[in-house]
UniProtKB/Swiss-Prot annotation:
Source organism phylogeny: Bacteria, Thermotogati, Thermotogota, Thermotogae, Thermotogales
Note accompanying the cofactor annotation: Binds 1 [4Fe-4S] cluster per subunit. The cluster is coordinated with 3 cysteines and an exchangeable S-adenosyl-L-methionine.
Residues the record lists as binding substrate: N66, M95, Y124, H163, S185, R186, G187, D226, G227, M228, R229, E265, F292
Protein's UniProt name: Phosphomethylpyrimidine synthase
A molecular-function term among this protein's GO annotations: carbon-carbon lyase activity
Native organism: Thermotoga sp. (strain RQ2)
Entry annotated with the keyword Lyase: yes
Top-level class of the enzyme under EC nomenclature: lyase
Length: 424
């Protein structure tokens, strides 16, 4: 049985118990949300996960970190280090998005070492193999679509991005759209290219039932990818984006009927004033399914600092109901991220998630804020560092300019906390 099927039958799995304990909620709440499809618990039957996560309504906002190789940069050891650092700094899941080297070796190695759920985009493998053999990114068969899904499932992947909403109808509209950037989703572009080359419908859409059978066999959580997501704020919230969303909304019901866990992926470039509308519309059309957003970025002019833009958009999106934030690194739109970029990206998105949790009244988040306030009141630096996401940076800065008495070198003897304590 899948986690959803177990939940519907009143069965409480070990993973449900673990996430309930982490969230600080009764396990019955976890079971109920999973049964309704308003939350997902990604866990392939073949992957042993030490730190499972629950994503969805009523639970803390989660953060995903993307790692993976690219042409000219395909070191397995570097990817393993990225994974280690991402997890150390609080990533709730990883996605392996490699496009060069031995893709299966890299994927299996990350799954084996990861204590958190691991996701992937199977269509990348089809495109990479096609390019390496034929120098053509979309020269592969319909069978390859599903063979790669099975291969990823067998390797223990817990959730998969499947760009099922890129249909012929949606694609016809994009050709005549006024978008500056027509398609920016790599998976969406690969599938669109294949459809145009072969004059065929998207196999993932046409044979969605077959995809559901595979997902059910392994208990893969399907993340319905937004291949038509806007790639710039000037293209946000257009007809192409929403038409694809309506297709995805229809397929949510099909997945639930099959007992397959499903979530929706959302836009990555959205002006701040449109974030609430996008999140609420996704929740409505997706019938309450969890929402997985890339960012979102509320400006396109933050190159080198896109992780900061991401944190701003992500905090607001999380407040309005987004459940799962995919991090963005300082290298976004520039280059393949290195280990330091991964660290910075995770911290930025974790800050966004925490800000959203506090604003949403999450009990655990508020308890930690109270602990930090008390630590500051008592000048308990070690507790302050331990509660901070960037504890190593905070400690380094404190030690670089030490102050011999209570307080720090910012205020010295003019510390407001000390003065208030002395004269109150």
């Amino acid at each position: 049985m899948t986690q959803m099927e177990m939940a519907r039958k009143g069965v409480v799995s070990d993973e449900m118990k673990k996430v309930a304990e982490y969230e600080g909620v009764d396990v019955e709440i976890v079971r109920q949300k999973l049964a309704e499809g308003r939350a997902v618990l990604p866990k392939n039957k073949l992957h042993r996960i030490e730190r499972p996560m629950i994503v969805g309504e009523g639970f803390s906002v989660k953060v995903n970190a993307n790692i993976g190789t690219s042409q000219g940069f395909s070191s397995l050891e570097e990817e393993k280090e990225k994974a280690r650092v991402a997890i150390e700094y609080g990533a709730d899941s990883l996605m392996v998005l490699s496009t060069w080297g031995d893709l299966r070796e890299i994927r299996r190695a990350i799954v084996e070492m990861s204590p958190v759920p691991v996701g992937s985009v199977p269509i990348y493998d089809s495109a990479v193999r096609s390019y390496q053999m034929k120098k053509n990114v979309v020269d592969f068969s319909e069978k390859d679509f599903f063979d790669m899904v099975i291969a990823h499932a067998e390797d223990g992947i817990d959730f998969m991005t499947i760009h099922v909403g890129v249909t012929r109808r949606v694609l016809d509209r994009i050709k005549s759209s006024r978008r500056v950037l027509k398609i920016v989703s790599r998976g969406g572009a690969i599938i669109a290219g294949w459809m145009i080359k072969n004059n065929r419908e998207n196999p993932f859409y046409e044979h969605f039932d077959e995809l559901l059978d595979i997902a059910k066999d392994y208990d893969i959580t399907l993340s319905l990818g937004d291949g038509m997501r806007p790639g710039a704020v000037v293209d946000a919230s257009d007809a192409q984006q929403f038409e694809e969303l309506f297709v995805m909304g229809e397929l949510v019901e099909k997945a639930r009927e099959k007992g397959v866990q499903v979530m929706l992926e959302g836009p990555g470039h959205v002006p701040l004033n449109e974030v609430e509308m996008n999140v609420r519309l996704m929740k409505k059309i997706g019938k309450g399914a969890p929402i997985f957003l890339l960012g979102p970025l509320p400006t396109d002019r933050a190159m080198g600092y896109d992780h900061i833009a991401c944190a701003i958009g992500g905090a607001l999106a999380g407040y309005y109901g987004a459940d799962f934030l995919c991090y963005v690194t300082p290298s976004e739109h520039i280059s393949l991220p290195d280990v330091e970029d991964v660290r910075e990206g995770v911290i930025a998105s974790k800050i966004a998630a925490i800000v959203a949790d506090v604003a949403r009244g999450n009990k655990k988040a508020w308890e930690l804020e109270k602990k930090m306030a008390l630590a500051r009141k008592n000048f308990d630096w070690e507790t302050m560092f331990s509660l901070s996401l960037g504890k190593d940076v905070a400690k380094k800065k404190y030690e670089e300019r030490p102050y011999p008495d209570k307080g720090c070198s910012m205020c010295g003897p003019f510390c407001a906390i000390k003065i208030a304590e002395e004269f109150s």
